[in-house]
Amino acid sequence: MLVTETLGAFGFNEQILSSVIDARARLLTADAVIIPRSIDLDLVPVDDASIYERRVNWWNEKPYGFDLSPLAVFASNIVFVGSVGSASFLAQPARVIAADLTTIATADVSGRAQFTTTRGGLLHGFAGWFRAKLADGIELSNEAPGSHWEHVFLPLQTPVHVEERTPIDVELESHDGLSWRWKGKIGEVPFDQMSALSSPPCRL
């Protein structure tokens, strides 16, 4: 039996996939029980000016008279942790990645989700959470507000105005939970962002 609680706010953040793959190959029999058995990731497009202002647009506000606006583009590629209320949802949440820990062979995973907005608004980004299946009928999730994990927020570099019934197509990639990429289309507006672009490049 393998029991692990290396769960980050977006499920894979603490490298649970590579850890389980390694432990399963070296330490477990073929019929071993793994807890959690699976981890699914859900996304939802959100209109949440509060978290966007605190996390991204703050860099455009010239704090203490300093122009830090060039850093806003880096902030827009960070996967932030924070609570997002359901009142900000612009569509119904959808499953984007499903990982079966009993069979998964790589820690690099990807998936796709499609949404249709249920109301108009300003789409600031996407909120996400995990759902871990521990056993039949027993799940652990940070979907509901109030957990210590909170949620994750994947911002857009530029918020997009949407009308009701706007189609949204999102692809999500995770490289062992260490780097993330979210890309797709909001109506006809493309976006492509990744956490690897969240830090200024350095030159030696």
Residue ranges of predicted features:
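Class I SAM-binding transferase module
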Residues: M1-L204
